[in-house]
Swiss-Prot record:
Residue ranges of domain sHSP in the record: 14-121
Extent of the B- repeats: 163-176, 178-191, 193-205
Stretches with biased composition (Low complexity): 346-366
Region (3 X 14 AA repeats B of [IMA]-[RK]-K-L-Q-E-E-A-K-A-K-E-[EK]-[LA]): 163-206
Membership in a protein family: Belongs to the small heat shock protein (HSP20) family.
UniProt-recorded name of the protein: Inactive protein RESTRICTED TEV MOVEMENT 2
Positions of the UniProt region annotated as Disordered: 345-366
Compartments where found: Cell membrane
Residue span of region 6 X 5 AA repeats A of L-E-E-[SKR]-[ERK]: 129-220
Function, as annotated: Seems to not be involved in heat resistance. Unable to mediate restriction of long-distance movement of the pathogenic tobacco etch virus (TEV) without causing a hypersensitive response or inducing systemic acquired resistance.
Pfam families, A to Z: HSP20
The UniProt record lists the keyword Zinc: no
UniProt keyword Hydrolase present: no
Amino acid sequence: MAARQQQKGTGFGVQYEDFVPKSEWKDQPEATILNIDLTGFAKEQMKVTYVHSSKMIRVTGERPLANRKWNRFNEVFTVPQNCLVDKIHGSFKNNVLTITMPKETITKVAYLPETSRTEAAALEKAAKLEEKRLLEESRRKEKEEEEAKQMKKQLLEEKEALIRKLQEEAKAKEEAEMRKLQEEAKANEEAAAKKLQEEIEAKEKLEERKLEERRLEERKLEDMKLAEEAKLKKIQERKSVDESGEKEKILKPEVVYTKSGHVATPKPESGSGLKSGFGGVGEVVKLAEEKLGNLVEKEKKMGKGIMEKIRRKEITSEEKKLMMNVGVAALVIFALGAYVSYTFCSSSSSSSSSSPSSSSSSTKPE
């Protein structure tokens, strides 16, 4: 038989090369001998099996080649009818596998007539045809089994690939969701931090504005207090000046010219008139001063507490009223002082203008 080769892959990167080894039958009187040429194979790389159901001998083997390739064969041979199955034996020598199949009846081919030889040749030909048919059927079955196995393997690989793809998609989806949740959590955290920072800044600005307002209020109150103290001091100074001028005017003697000379006499009428004229104003000024003094003393006693309450914005309506009264009293005293000063000045000027006329009338000679 001529050898033929065929390449097959398994999907794992290993390739098999199938081939049909050369075989030769020899018919001897004692036995039928089958020689198979297996060059390149070792004894351990082949296997011979007798199949009782089909009365056939199966010879298989495989050996590795280079680049992940394997060389293999699978041959089936029909056992002759008059063969002793229990005595079949084989040997491997010089790359040739020899299978000896002893016969039940020893034939002497040399002494057979011509007709017997023809029948033997026909039988041998029929046996070879049957062997060929069985071999082809066996190969067809093996091919079908191999295709079924390959199809099953392919389906299994496709199933595994599909499962692997689904797992990868699920993992990618899970990672995307996890990444999205992390980004959302980070964004929420940043937004919360930003909002908290804005609230802190707004609170600080509010505190600064309140503090500035308190400072302005304290400054205004301090300015008001200083202004009131200055007004009070000015009123007191004017009062002292007015009182000294009034006393000097009351005690100043009036000069009366007579024949004997001029005589200085006091003028009680002027004093009484001045007293009667300015008595009401003096009493009002005195009452205003007493009230202002009481309010100032009370403010001095409570001043520290009021200023502290103003800073804290805890001042009561009564304390506000007290501060307003202090301001009003100061203004009243200032107005009364101005009025008194104006009145005294007017009185002084009128008295001065009337003195020369009286003196001229009194110095008229008799």
